[in-house]
Amino acid sequence: MAPADGHAAGTGRGLPLLLTAPPADAPSPREVLQHRPLLFFGGKGGVGKTTLAAAVAVGSADAGRRTLLVSTDPAHSVGDVLRIGLGNEPSGVLPNLWALEIDPTEEADRYIAGVKERIAEVTPPRLAAEVERQIDVARVSPGAEEAALFDRFTRLMEEAGTGYERVVFDTAPLGHTLRLLALPEQLQQWIRGLIGRRRQVNVMRRMWRNVAGAAAGEARPDDPVLEALEERRARFARARDALTDPTRAAFVFVVTPERLPILETERATRILERYRIPVGAVVVNRVLPAAAEGPFAERRRDEEAGHLDDIRRRFAAHALLGVPQLPRDVQGLDDLRRLWEVLGRALPR
């Protein structure tokens, strides 16, 4: 990776890629981008988070780290940036890079099928049809796909340190992503309630069997429904612990020097702070290069300067990295490698 000289050779003379040095108590952006096992890229739609997530994943793979790049955005574009077709399961991209685009519909169908299988084991035959109908109704209810997506999301998080050294997430636009990241706290409470009620049901069953004797039938030595709930509670607890561990996870916000992305990103950083999810850096994308000339560029540069000052003020607690507006779209592995080199020049050693 190129030296951290604070300038982007060949992409705009004098561009201050390291917009501010990280505060003393902030994590090193170099360590975050190069080594953090769980890395989440997020931002307002259209700011370039997918491209930057892919560039970091390619750089990680080229450095010899087994890396999984995951898109949780329903409007997938990771495959477009990589110029390969992707599906709901990992596909090989490079010797150390795999990528997938989570399909919420497929995940919801798979999730519901698993629920039906577990419920069928403990449902009396006379109730089976009605129970299955109720499950099918739940499949099309609001939040079903989001819950299934989160279930897959937590499973993929556990791949970091097991199947892969790093998992890089290209997340959906901020509103959707913040709801997803808030789910561990919300679902923990919900599952605790379900487990409590399930245990009460099991107590009543045992009491009934003791009273009814052999006529009540043999008691099951296990309860697949309770086992599934306990497994999910444990997995969601691990997800919450991982998300809030600054040595394991970091969220990288991508913002452009424009008013609306700045405001939305500031609100998002406050929400993550509330949930104790560490912010590793803020990347300011598409900064106008100093080499750009002409009346339009001058007017744009004047307006951008005000936005950059605003960014420095609003995100003073975080490392701020700048990426210049490039002369053409980033497409394919070679372009992503060049972008990773540009970003690398901003990383303090």
Where are these regions (language model features)?
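Nucleotide-state-sensitive switch-loop elements of NTP-binding domains
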Residues: 13-39, 47, 52-230
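Aromatic side chains
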Residues: 40-41, 111, 164, 251, ...
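Conserved phosphate-coordination/catalytic loops
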Residues: 144-147, 230-233, 259, 301-302
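C-terminal lobe/tail of nucleotide-utilizing enzymes
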Residues: 1-33, 85, 205, 236-349
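P-loop (Walker A) phosphate-binding loop of NTP-binding proteins
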Residues: 44
